[in-house]
Amino acid sequence: MIFPKRPPMIEETPNNPSFSWNATAFFEDLTKRNKLAQKKGFTFCRVSGLDGFEELLGKMMTKTAFVCVSDISQGFTDINNTPHTRRVKTVFLAMRHAIDDMKARERCMNTMRELFRQFMSVLIMEQTRLQEHSIYVDPRISFQEIDRYFLSGCACAYFQIGVETYTDLQYNTDEWL
């Protein structure tokens, strides 16, 4: 069995020796290497939440299917007992179809559901690797289908992945004036 290539992790910084998971590189690699994604013409894009779809919009005239990772995340830092930071990354899926063709839209949704399933089959293996670096993927990954008015002529869905990492919150006098 050949596993997908492991994307490099973000390097640690001098003040925070924690590792971090690069979700953008991970899903870009999966999009390039997945047979279904390639067969259906999925293109990888970076976006900034629901309002920042500039890269996708620029490619919509020539491409028909998209995997978009948001470069922003929601999250929090827990300062009790074992300090850790939780970040939630969002991955959008979109496929163009003829406007008002509900059968075509359903075929697109079925393709995106299957692509999500295939991506999760690799994320299970990635989760094990990440745990070796004290990075924990929340096993409850939400998948939401977006109604037909979000992006005209596109079936859209998104999923969110919660990731928790150790956060070094030791007071360091070198960081303060």
Model feature map: region roles:
Residues 44-58:
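Short N-terminal edge-element motif at the start of the domain
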Residues 57-60, 80-81:
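Short secondary-structure boundary/capping segments within folded domains
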Residues 59-74:
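A short, hydrophobic beta-strand-centered structural micro-motif
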Residues 1-47, 71-177:
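Charged, amphipathic alpha-helical segments and their flanking helix caps
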